[in-house]
UniProtKB/Swiss-Prot annotation:
Annotated protein name in UniProt: Membrane-bound lytic murein transglycosylase F
Role summary: Murein-degrading enzyme that degrades murein glycan strands and insoluble, high-molecular weight murein sacculi, with the concomitant formation of a 1,6-anhydromuramoyl product. Lytic transglycosylases (LTs) play an integral role in the metabolism of the peptidoglycan (PG) sacculus. Their lytic action creates space within the PG sacculus to allow for its expansion as well as for the insertion of various structures such as secretion systems and flagella.
Membrane topology: Peripheral membrane protein
Organism per entry: Desulfosudis oleivorans (strain DSM 6200 / JCM 39069 / Hxd3)
GO cellular component, one term: cell outer membrane
Residue numbers annotated as active site: 311
Major localization class: membrane
Region named LT domain: 266-454
Domain of life: Bacteria
Amino acid sequence: MRRPLRRVTVVLLWVALAIGVAWFYDYRRSMQSLWKIRQHGKIVVLTENNANSYYIYKETPMGFEYDLAKAFAGHLGVDLEVKTPGWDALFASLQRGDGDFIAASMTHTRKREQYADFSEPYLSVRQHLILHKSDHSIVTPAGLAGRTVHVREDTTYQQRLEALQADGIDLQLVLHRNTPTEELIEQVAKRQIDITVADSAIALLNRRYYPDIRIAFPIEKEQPLAWAVRKGDRGLRTEINRFFDEIKENGTFTRIYNRYYTAVDTFDYVDVKKFHQRIYTRLPRFRPLIEKAADRHGFDWQMIAAVIYQESHFDPFAQSHTGVKGLMQLTRVTAEEMGVTDRFDFEQNITAGVAYLAKLRHRFDDIEDPRTRLLFALASYNIGYGHVRDAQQIAKNMGMDPNRWQSLKEVLPLLRNREYYADTTYGYARGNEAVRYIERILTYYDILKQKKAV
């Protein structure tokens, strides 16, 4: 009796050992890519080359997905390499090992799970119809009957529109193999096609470039965006999830998101439409002086142009009831300080205004990040250096980092409330206007960056 029992025990031990060995090798294989990434000191991201994910401007890489991927590489302590094989080749490139993960504002769907494993969602979006601003003929999905909709092939847009067709809506669907959604949006703006579909993030970002479009109602419930890794790559997937948890907790995700999308939320069609026109009708007259002054003080000339448009709409004779005058809306005190004899002389105005902005930026040399230092200087240009320092103190009192733009953005509006400004040095200020001021400048700046003819 004991011998059969012993035999069963031995068999069970061998089975357990086999399972353990199989688990060990499976676990080792699932962790191998992360180990190799750290060994080689580099991670390769597969993404899209567009305004939403990744693009190069003056030799500087930018884009929402790029910034997230760059932060992830920093989280791992490795360098980042970017590859853009094209939307249709993303999964194939991942499976071949051309890249380690996909970061391309990709929605996580069941169909795509057969090609890759996905991280936890980091953002949710909704699909919207995109029409010309003059087209108000469609108010419900049923209004698509008899209309033609253009979308990129093999996207969730195609899947949703086919579902509407299956529900009985007689729409005509035109699929584009190699045409990015951004180009279809441009075609709507130029009246080359009537309708396309884009998710909310892509739609918002592109509306600033194509103010003639209208973002209509959503045609789908919220969908999750996630990063993709090779099937079975649990190690990298787990690390990505840990990374997103970390950056959402410490505010990094919010800062990156706000850089690309917050200013879009304050979109004003009439104002942006005028800006697009005045880039060609007014800006050329002042551009040489703007470039000269910007170069002297180490600014991007397009940022200075954006500031000037926010201040005066490129009108050299602009003046306010507060007494500020000229292209950069100089106060009398600032003009005297900077040696300006005529604030309506646009050469004097630009030269002095840019020099003064550089002076303000220098006063924030304790802030290491150049972009943050610029934003603090712009806030000071708008409401005054003293108020910005007051806001920093409030942020510090609230346990926030006073040298972060996200902190300043949250506390500046508090300068309107007595319970906060009563104990400050400079008192009351309309800090919310300073926040909106900077958001508009960033919108104008981004438009100028994307303008190929400027």
